[in-house]
């Protein structure tokens, strides 16, 4: 195990998820004045519990893509690191400076697996610090960092599959009422900005 870690020292960058995650947790515990995020389009988007599946897949997509590229193509992995972690820090800084919340989550009452998953998410993911959406930022940032270098030209099916999942992840945030459309746009803006800065 020690030899494996010595050989793959770049895996250590993934420990930054714990650091930024700790800061995010702290931002949710502080008694900050959270401002409500809402737009008219949010009211027109229906609650669609089945979208909890791509929302949950985000938890596999982000570390999975980064781990895969760490072994498959270290150059792309480094670009992912330079795009994702500074962007996460920026988002967390925004959470401290401009704390936000949503107040339009439904009760998700009734039976069925999808509604149960939504209730579980609601119980464990507080509707605070929603702008910009970390779900959308990280999904878009990882996809851009992975395929912007031309990697997708030789791995077209992989690129298309990733793009479809990223779109579904972004849609899921509004269809299960975890985010406002404004949060999605904010996350996309941060992702594109960090991607451009990372080169």
Protein language model features and the residues they cover:
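Residue-level signature of transmembrane alpha-helical entry/exit and packing/kink sites
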Residues: 9-13, 17, 79-80, 159-162, ...
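Hydrophobic faces of alpha-helical transmembrane segments in multi-pass integral membrane proteins
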Residues: 15, 19, 23, 82, ...
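Aromatic-anchored segments of alpha-helical transmembrane domains
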Residues: 21-26, 88-96, 164-174
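Membrane-interface loops
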Residues: 27-42, 47, 70-154
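Alpha-helical transmembrane segments of integral membrane proteins
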Residues: 52-56, 60, 79-83, 132, ...
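Generic transmembrane alpha-helix motif of multi-pass integral membrane proteins
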Residues: 64-69
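Membrane-embedded catalytic cores of phosphoryl/pyrophosphoryl-handling enzymes
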Residues: 119-199
């Amino acid at each position: 195990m020690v030899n494996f870690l010595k050989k793959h020292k770049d895996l250590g960058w993934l420990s930054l998820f714990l650091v930024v995650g700790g800061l995010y947790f702290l931002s949710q515990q502080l008694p900050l004045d959270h401002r409500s995020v809402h737009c008219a389009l949010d009211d027109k988007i229906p609650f669609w519990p089945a979208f909890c599946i791509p929302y949950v897949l985000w938890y596999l997509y982000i570390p999975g893509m980064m781990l895969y590229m760490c072994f498959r193509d270290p150059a792309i992995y480094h670009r992912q690191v330079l795009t994702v972690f500074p962007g996460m820090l920026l988002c967390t800084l925004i959470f401290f400076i401009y704390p936000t919340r949503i107040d339009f989550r439904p009760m998700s009452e009734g039976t069925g697996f999808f509604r149960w998953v939504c209730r579980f998410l609601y119980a464990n993911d507080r509707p605070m610090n929603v702008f910009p959406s970390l779900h959308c930022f990280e999904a878009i940032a990882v996809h851009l960092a992975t395929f912007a270098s031309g990697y997708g030209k030789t791995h077209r099916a992989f690129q298309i599959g990733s793009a479809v999942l990223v779109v579904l992840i972004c849609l899921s945030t509004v269809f299960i009422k975890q985010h406002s459309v404004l949060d999605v746009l904010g996350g996309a803006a941060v992702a594109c900005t960090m991607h451009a800065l990372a080169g």
